[in-house]
Amino acid sequence: QKEVAQRLPEKSQDETEAQPSASRINSKLEIPVMLTKREEIKLQRTGYTVSYNNFYKTPNWVAWELTRQETKGSEERKNRFVPDPDLPEPRVEHADYTRSGYDRGHMAPAADMKWSKKAMEESFYMSNICPQNQKLNRDDWGDLEELCRSWARKYGTVHIACGPIYDKKQPKRIGEHRVAVPDRFFKVVLIYNRKSPIAMGFLFDNKAHHQAPVSYTHLRAHE
């Protein structure tokens, strides 16, 4: 039987007035269905939920809601990547990525967690990180993250889920803890609180070349 761990976020005195409401925590419109054919440890954080795969040592997916108010947060990132304390040992560490040639690529981006000190700190848990091509992480992937924030500011709320895709049965591994390197990444964005909801899906190869928007997979409802 698959191990499924759940931890509800504790309220923090460090959270700003933009902290999530009870309705946000309970609704979780962005959460994918539970996996049945893949190892899964599900953990609910202050700002996101992660389905972690202990075989690949990366998430299956990470999902979160981003609101207009949360984009106004001022919490600064500290770049302190740490093992996830709620995962079984041995745990992925910061050093597993050192000199690997890959970035420590956030799934739920730190810039989406500026509304809470705790949310910001938890975004640097290694369970929220994947080996990501440096150019992809800093260009196309980062550009889409900024687009999502602009949509949150425009529409009020966006629901986001993303994660790695492994095309090979035996993917490349890095580090002492043998972290699997994804072949691709997906991101799904839902803008629900409008007359005609919009859903968009994006696929990125884990490579250095620029991937123009026309190569993405788009799923859009009638506007």
Predicted features and spans:
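Domain-level detector for secreted/extracellular nuclease and nuclease-toxin modules, and
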Residues: Q1-R220
